[in-house]
Amino acid sequence: MNRILIIAFLLLTATAFCGERETIRDAHGKVVGTATTDGNKTVYRDAHGKVTGTATTNGNKTTYRDATGKAVGTATEAGNRTTYRDAHGKTVGTATESGNKTTYRDATGKTSGTATNTGNGTTYRDATGKTVGTKR
């Protein structure tokens, strides 16, 4: 379950610089998708290039949509903390940044994983510290 949460957070929180494409890999280095940002919109694709969803940012709020365009959730930033909500507004998790590390917690506050940024990418780990993916 934690692996699924981390991969979901990875896909939901993957950001890129304007016009830049980032490759998302699993723990074994296999490409599982990409995130391409242009302006305030990010398009997520699976390993085969099929669109799996989008994210549009306006101010401190990002709205996530599935491949059909249906809103599936939001992320609202306040300082170093981001709160994730489902399509009904219920909190499903948070992300708190401290230095080069982001800690992800579920709705109950239990740590579900971390992301550590380095000069050349991000490494994602589950609650036990096991690497579950990377982004370059």
Regions found by a protein language model. Give the residues of each.
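Repetitive, compositionally biased segments used for assembly/scaffolding
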Residues: 19-136
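Sec-dependent N-terminal signal peptides
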Residues: 4-15
